[in-house]
Amino acid sequence: MLQSNEYFSGKVKSIGFTSSSTGRASVGVMVEGEYLFSTAEPEEMTVISGALNVLLPEATEWQVYQAGQVFNVPGHSEFHLQVAEPTSYLCRYL
């Protein structure tokens, strides 16, 4: 079953799914903007296209992740994203 999600007045859209190869996950697109996300459980984020400028919990410096790069976010935390161009991603819920 696919689940459509929309955040930040439609600036972030994703489709949630479950598969044997990725487990529970979502794939989505973000347009230009700054976003604050909260996690309920640990997440693994893979940038598919574009780039994300990320401030992870406990971090003091932003880090850019390009297409093909992966970062992890702890559960029960918040992380900040700056998006300069439309960017697609895969989020796996660990």
Curated annotation (Swiss-Prot):
GO terms for molecular function: guanosine phosphorylase activity; purine-nucleoside phosphorylase activity; thymidine phosphorylase activity; uridine phosphorylase activity. It catalyses: a purine D-ribonucleoside + phosphate = a purine nucleobase + alpha-D-ribose 1-phosphate; adenosine + phosphate = alpha-D-ribose 1-phosphate + adenine; cytidine + phosphate = cytosine + alpha-D-ribose 1-phosphate; guanosine + phosphate = alpha-D-ribose 1-phosphate + guanine. Its EC number is 2.4.2.1, 2.4.2.2. The keyword Signal does not apply. The keyword Transferase applies. It comes from the Bacteria. GO terms for cellular component: cytosol. It is an enzyme of class 2 (transferase). Keywords: Glycosyltransferase, Transferase. Catalyzes the phosphorolysis of diverse nucleosides, yielding D-ribose 1-phosphate and the respective free bases. Can use uridine, adenosine, guanosine, cytidine, thymidine, inosine and xanthosine as substrates. Also catalyzes the reverse reactions. This is Pyrimidine/purine nucleoside phosphorylase. It comes from Escherichia fergusonii (strain ATCC 35469 / DSM 13698 / CCUG 18766 / IAM 14443 / JCM 21226 / LMG 7866 / NBRC 102419 / NCTC 12128 / CDC 0568-73). The lineage of its organism: Bacteria, Pseudomonadati, Pseudomonadota, Gammaproteobacteria, Enterobacterales. The gene is ppnP.
